[in-house]
Amino acid sequence: WSAANRSLKFRSARLSPLMTKVLVSDPIDQAGIDILTQVAQVDQKVGLSIDQLKNIISDYDGLMIRSGTQVTSDVISEAKNLRIIGRAGVGVDNVDVPAATRKGVLVVNSPGGNTIAAAEHALAMILALSRNIPQAHASMFAGGWDRKKYVGNELYKKVLGVVGLGKIGSHVAKVANAMGMEVIGFDPFVSIERAQQMQVRLSDLEELFKQSDYVTLHLPRTPETENLVDIDLLRKMKPTARLVNCARGGIIDENDLANALEANVIKGAAIDVYAKEPLTENSPLRSVSQGLILTPHLGASTVEAQQNVAIDVAEQIRDVLLGLPARSAVNIPGLSAEIMDSLKPHLKLAETLGLLVSQISGGQIQKLEVRLQGEFAQHPSQPLVIATLKGLLTSALGDKINYVNASLEAKGR
């Protein structure tokens, strides 16, 4: 329903590819490009700087990116025609989502497209740490044959701590259980019942770090999680423990991790994501002499995952440009196409009622209360509330207000 206001404009008319333009600014699988060309002129311009993107973004109705493109508030402020930003992947920390919301630009991602790839990379890191595979490989190519030096550890009956039990973390837990590991988890949004279904014992964060032989991180980068894993938390780990991060950069304090490895505070770590990417040449991680495996953000880099996320996000961009709902909207509640179809006339009515209220109110409106009765009460309430807000604010903001930014604009008044 996120594009309901646009569907009212376009009705069932088809968009001409000559009228609509989509910019693809990161490498995207051809399957996704083929979908976009059904409804738009597609320009592929990879490696743009922020200034270059600012200079051209006003020409486009849609933007499709991966992790490389930085969609800052300055870029969004220049996006006069932009309706949707599609992130071919999960994390949207390279998009200023609040700025997009204020501008009325829908942001979508693909939360399930690279689940298997990311989970398998984390598991591969755990196995590589356990059996010293990178070090043994390098030794062989240097002419060595040292079996004693690279004696490893079995994962069977070891304790795996999973921080974040979303789609990726829960899949890691599933495979780890199958390998005979004991899995404990930390996730404040997961119930005891759900954890039991996953065969995961819930723990607080500090206890998880104390008890685990391996800790794997699967959580987003937010102000609350930035540098979450610092020297204090690392010191709570066993000296034989290993740490894996294939989630988002910036969750681990990289200086603290480098120091902890050099001082034998923990046995090892495997890192795929970094606070700043590409990883700088003078990063302290590049100077660690023992126990560290580094990969260049390969978590979602499989043929299958690249294709999955490209198709998923391209379909969402196509649908939104045609006035249909998006499956995985980040900055607005998502609804199925079936519910959207049933809601369309009610959304229009709610919008009209909001406009009527704005015209008959005698002064500044301090509070808006929406009550649903009868047939209305059978539908999800939030879309109807937002439609009412859109109508209410239209008289003051005109075309600047839409279903994406209506709630945010109302809260700011």
Residue ranges and their predicted role:
Residues 18-108, 230:
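An N-terminal-biased, well-structured beta-alpha scaffold segment characteristic
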Residues 103, 111-159, 163, 171-178, ...:
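Phosphate-binding beta-alpha-beta segment of Rossmann-like dinucleotide-binding domains, i.e.
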Residues 45-46, 66, 88-89, 105-116, ...:
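Short beta->alpha connector loops at strand-helix junctions that form conserved
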Residues 119-138, 158, 177-181, 311-325, ...:
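Oxidoreductase and adenylate-handling cofactor-binding alpha/beta cores
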